[in-house]
Amino acid sequence: MRSLRGITALGAVVVGTVAIEAVYAVRRKLPLLDEFDASGSIGPPDGIPLLMVILGDSSCTGPGVAEPSEIWFRLVSARLAERGYRVTIRSFAVGGAKSSTALETQVPAAEALNPDLTFIAVGTNDVIHQVPLTTLEKNLDEIIRRMTRVSKLVLVAGVGDLGTVPRLLPPLRQLATRRGRRGDVVQARAAQRHGAIKADLWGAAAEAFRTDPSIFSADLFHPAAPGHQVWADAAWSALEPHLTRE
């Protein structure tokens, strides 16, 4: 009985500590950063036309960067331009969006365009706000299914190691890592089911986020330009092998 009481007491302490850290992470005074609509065009005027659509959250609106050209998918589009593509970008991303938001408001607008390339970067807010992973997977299934029907190629960004976020402190950081990993597994399954490609945010990308303090912006949550470069590298590694097939 004594050991059981001890375990119960320890559990209460852990839960209480996590709750305190969560409140601290949300309420501490940090700067609010500008966001961008990174729609636009890049590449030679006589290049191969390529329409890219973006479904996403703040990872695609760029709080933490100085200008839209530093956002990860704009960096990818610059590499496509170097390959001779004339890239037209239509971003439907909204900061704070969950998978349900993307499904309800972003997908209908995007699928009407019949894009050549679709980037899907939602799910992190689902993970952060404790949306059941079954719900996340169901929403992603529908998002990816609908976009693969109209888009020649679909890339799913996934969820990275949220435990690297400086705003979080232990033990919340460890919990964020575990839940982020589970969320990414859900994204990988959904991508595979529908023939989409998936970026790897848990290899070199996660290591960079863990070790490079310049990755994060002043709000200690969103990545700065170096973080977007890491994301662009991960997306390009997944995308580049498929370019000659399109």
Residue ranges and their predicted role:
Residues 104-245:
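Alpha-helical cap/lid subdomain in secreted, periplasmic
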Residues 51-53, 59-138:
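Conserved SGNH/GDSL esterase-like catalytic core that processes O-acyl groups on lipids
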Residues 1-53, 66, 83, 236, ...:
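N-terminal secretory targeting modules
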Residues 22-28, 63, 90-92, 128, ...:
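N-terminal start-of-chain detector that recognizes signal peptides
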Residues 44, 81-84, 148, 190:
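A generic structural signal for short, solvent-exposed coil/turn residues
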Residues 35, 71-73, 180-181, 203:
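Short amphipathic alpha-helical surface micro-motifs
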Residues 28-38, 58-66, 95-101, 140-147, ...:
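Short, mixed-charge, low-aromatic patches
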Residues 55-56, 157:
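Short hydrophobic segments within beta-strands
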